[in-house]
A protein has these predicted regions:
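Transmembrane alpha-helix/interfacial motif
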Residues: 1-44
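Alpha-helical membrane-interface segments at transmembrane helix boundaries
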Residues: 1-4, 83-97, 128-139
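Alpha-helical hydrophobic packing sites
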Residues: 6, 29, 103-106, 146
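Membrane-embedded alpha-helical segments of inner-membrane proteins
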Residues: 15, 121-128, 148-151
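Predominantly long cytosolic amphipathic alpha-helical stalk/bundle segments
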Residues: 31-125, 153-182
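Hydrophobic alpha-helical transmembrane segments of polytopic membrane proteins
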Residues: 137-153
Length: 182
């Protein structure tokens, strides 16, 4: 492989993006899923009357334990804070999904420019000389698209999981507020 320093840098950057994408996904997926399980158990206990308040491992428990009478503003603040903390890293997935195809394309353009530059200095240019160089340059675009596909897919999965968590927290808040009103 006779790649330029820029092409190698582009592929290295895309490799870092790839690792970061999987790191953020698995980390956040585990955290959000465990919180969903915890909040679902807490909500079930509220619905069935096993408990008059959220479980102590609930994300909104800390907020509720500080006030004598829960109100909508406190519960919304608790829910918003829990979602904010749970979805850390989603912005990075968006950035990676949006930028990696362009980074890959940049690597391809540089590779093709270098190929044409080398061809200009040679006396003959046959397909056997041009094709391997151009196919090597296209690897950067393929890598960028692959990284973007994973990042975008993982972003959507985590966004859906965050919505599930938000719904559970909202349901718990509604049950708690209805108990206060009684």
């Amino acid at each position: 492989m006779d790649s330029s320093a820029i092409t190698i840098f582009v592929l290295l950057l895309l490799s870092i993006y790839f690792i970061a994408t999987f790191w953020v996904f698995f980390d956040r997926y585990y955290i959000i899923n465990s919180r969903i399980s915890s909040e679902a158990r807490s909500l079930k206990a509220l619905y069935t009357g096993q408990s008059k308040s959220v479980a102590s491992n609930s994300l909104i428990f800390t907020y509720l334990s500080r006030v004598t009478t829960p109100n909508k503003a406190i519960l919304q603040a608790a829910s918003s804070d829990a979602i904010r903390v749970s979805t850390k890293g989603l912005t990075w997935l968006s950035i990676i999904a949006a930028t990696s195809p362009f980074i890959g394309l940049f690597g391809t353009v540089i590779g093709i420019l270098e190929t044409f530059s080398k061809l200009g200095s040679q006396s003959s240019a046959s397909l056997s000389v041009v094709a391997p160089a151009i196919s090597e340059a296209l690897i950067a675009t393929a890598a960028g698209i692959a990284v973007a596909t994973f990042a975008y897919t993982f972003h959507l999965i985590l966004k859906r999981k965050a919505y599930e968590l938000s719904s559970l927290l909202a349901s718990q808040s509604e049950v708690i507020l209805s108990q206060v009103e009684e």
